[in-house]
């Protein structure tokens, strides 16, 4: 389960919280597959766009655009980045501005010919895969830091000081 605050993340690699199978069945939410482009349509995150790197559900303040055989996540993500200001211009509501889900559904999408689209995917997909890999690696490094730092600060783990390591390469 992700809330709209998660859309601030460049890539969504973990949920805000977890939902049970029963919770999924009893609610109106749908499971969004990995590589879905998500857009925050209300509140402080209005207009923020992210890409799911996991399967997850979202609350009603998020719209998901699922890739298909023609339009992959890489294309949808950048197309939505390109037109988001138009969507925001259509916002409605008094107290809390929001973009109507129907307006998202009405957005026209540029359809390049298949050859151009395939060339685009060949160029962009490796970069998207690397970004995804880096996001997961960063999260693992953060967890490792959070595990080790308190132990280092308390003295539970000691780092041996090797004089050879401390010598500058410039000396």
Predicted regions and their residues:
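Amphipathic alpha-helical coiled-coil/heptad-repeat segments
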Residues: 70-71, 75-78, 82-97, 102-171
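A generic structural signal for residues embedded in beta-strands
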Residues: 38-40
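Sequence-specific dsDNA recognition surfaces
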Residues: 3-34, 53, 58
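Short, Lys/Arg- and Gly-enriched loop/turn segments at beta-strand edges
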Residues: 46-52
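Glycine- and aromatic-enriched periplasmic loops at the membrane-periplasm interface
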Residues: 60-62
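Conserved catalytic-core motifs characterized by acidic clusters
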Residues: 14-15, 49, 95-98
